[in-house]
Regions:
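Aromatic "clamp/platform" in nucleotide-sugar-dependent glycosyltransferases that forms part
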Residues: 274, 293
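Donor nucleotide-sugar binding/catalytic pocket of nucleotide-sugar-dependent glycosyltransferases
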Residues: 60-63, 158, 162-198
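Conserved acidic donor-binding segment of nucleotide-sugar-dependent glycosyltransferases
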Residues: 325-326, 330-336, 344-350
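A conserved mid-protein helix/loop that constitutes part of the nucleotide-sugar donor-binding site
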Residues: 18-26, 217-232, 254, 302
């Protein structure tokens, strides 16, 4: 690159809680500041803003509206009225965002707007407003993983995504979900998850628990599969526990506990709530259960690899792209298969699995390697060329 590229990153969260936001933070850490100058637009003031400013990144606050709805069974007319009301709010938010960007960043010549998530249209509009390039980071399926539907419809959303100057899909499954076959500059590479400097020795003294970790505990994240498999395994009779990390609705927690109660396992299930510092849990767990029905990638799978925790992963979404069955972890297609794997893994020496999984994580998910990939995307976009990694 002959000049520093100034990039405005658009985030949809004011607080770092979801995988997309954490991955965006890893991305910004990975950048070579002599080549790329990052600016960040956030929807509010929170702990994430402080983390970015500690890295020397200028942040501005402006509306970032996710124009999506969860699935509902209301009648068509009611949905239309609601959609019109939401669209009016969205347009006002966009106008306000454009004004704030114009005022706060008037001294910057922005080259690229980088949307950090599939779930926002703000980046598309701001790129048009600023007459600059647009890179769209596709980190979610939206419908398969979050059960969201865009108010503008999937046909129109895909059309907008494929009109971006470049897209970055975090797995082949996500790319296939969103990108047309002949779309140019459709890159695919995994998220950055860790810095190599954070690598520590594997804890060889595992404790007797299986770990389930997700921002939210719900059926679509497979929390019910984890419970059913644990109950079927009977491992609680040998003193093993099932530990849940993540936000959980009271009613849903009671539903899961009822399953455990039916087999006498309720004293062997712990709900520890949302936890930002997950490393101690991964490093000591017997195994991590990735049960999400359609995980786009799964940062927690890589967290497990990184911390020497064997992974049992559901054979759906992007998970099979991370796990080579029998070599870096184990895949399952049913609750019965998961239960059987849980019974097997407590009897095995998992040293080779842990070593291969860790090496895979080091080769594919470090900040140190990630920044170079972003540079290739930006250079391609600025040169108006086409290239694939």
């Amino acid at each position: 690159m002959n000049k520093t590229i100034t990039t405005l990153f658009i985030f949809h969260e004011a607080s770092a809680s979801g995988g997309a936001t954490y991955s965006g933070l890893n991305m910004i850490r990975s950048l070579d500041r002599s080549k790329i100058t990052p600016l960040v637009l956030l929807p509010g003031d929170g702990d994430f803003k402080q983390q970015l400013e500690d890295l020397g990144v200028k942040c501005i606050i402006a509306p970032v509206d996710c124009l999506f709805r969860t699935h509902d069974e209301s009648i068509f007319l009611v949905r239309c009225i609601h959609a019109c009301a939401r669209f009016r709010i969205y347009v006002r938010s966009l106008i306000k965002a454009c004004r704030i960007v114009h005022k706060e960043l008037k001294d910057y010549n922005i080259d690229i707007v980088h949307s950090n998530t599939t779930a926002i249209l703000t980046g598309y509009v701001l790129a048009k407003y600023l007459h600059c390039k647009h890179v769209w980071h596709l980190r979610e399926f939206l419908d398969k993983d979050l059960h969201w539907k865009p108010y503008i419809g999937f046909y129109m959303l895909r059309k907008l995504i494929n009109s971006a100057d470049a897209t970055i899909s975090i797995t082949s499954a996500v790319k296939k979900h969103w990108i047309y076959e002949k779309t140019e500059n459709a890159f695919q590479f995994f998220n950055a998850v860790k810095s190599i400097s954070s690598l520590k020795n594997v804890n060889e003294h595992k404790e007797k628990y299986f770990l389930f970790c997700s921002t939210a505990l719900e059926d679509y994240k497979g929390a019910n599969w984890a419970m059913e498999a644990f109950c079927k395994s009977g491992l609680f009779n040998d003193g093993y526990k099932l530990v849940y990390l993540g936000n959980c609705r009271h009613e849903y927690k009671q539903k899961l506990l009822m399953m455990a109660h039916d087999v006498g396992a309720e004293d062997y299930v712990d709900f520890l709530g949302y936890c930002k510092q997950t490393t101690p849990f991964f490093s000591k767990a017997t195994a991590f259960l990735m049960c999400s029905e359609n995980e786009a990638m799964g940062r927690t799978t890589i967290e497990a690899f990184w911390n020497g925790c064997p992974v049992l992963g559901r054979n759906t979404g992007g998970t099979p792209e991370l796990i080579e069955n029998g070599k870096t972890g184990f895949l399952f297609d049913s609750i019965e298969e998961l239960s059987s794997l849980m019974q097997d893994i407590v009897k095995k020496d998992n040293t080779k699995i842990i070593e291969k999984a860790r090496e895979f994580a080091i080769q594919n998910f470090t900040e140190e390697k990630y920044g170079k990939k972003i540079e290739i995307v930006y250079k391609t976009v600025m040169d108006n060329g086409t290239k694939e990694l």
